[in-house]
């Protein structure tokens, strides 16, 4: 982990053959802790921490097959609406 301030990331992982959500979530939760990860959908997670997007990508490298993909996005600003997003979790992380 770097010495920078924590930020919000979105991790999207997809496969034509299998659902990757649990596999990817477990791998990331092992590194950052379950309290800083929220599942957004079958293919997407919100992750809060002082990790570079490339670090998170590299954690997933050994899990994904050649035909599977992952994208890690880092946000400077965000906003949310509706019950599908854990508002209390976001508020506690600078929302």
Positions of PLM-derived features:
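N-terminal start-of-chain detector that recognizes signal peptides
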Residues: 16-20, 42-45
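Short, intrinsically disordered low-complexity segments
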Residues: 31-76
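Short, low-order "capping/linker" segments at domain edges
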Residues: 54-59, 80-95
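Conserved, structured core segments of small domains
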Residues: 19-31
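Short, flexible beta-strand-to-coil junctions
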Residues: 14-19, 75-77
């Amino acid at each position: 982990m770097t010495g920078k301030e924590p930020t919000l990331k979105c991790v999207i992982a997809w496969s034509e053959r299998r659902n990757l959500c649990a596999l990817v979530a477990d791998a990331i939760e092992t590194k950052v802790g379950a309290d800083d990860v929220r599942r957004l959908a079958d293919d997407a997670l919100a992750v809060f921490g002082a990790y570079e997007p490339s670090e998170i990508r590299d954690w997933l490298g050994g899990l994904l097959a050649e035909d599977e993909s992952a994208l890690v996005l880092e946000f400077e600003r965000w906003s949310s609406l509706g019950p599908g997003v854990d508002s209390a979790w976001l508020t506690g992380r600078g929302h």
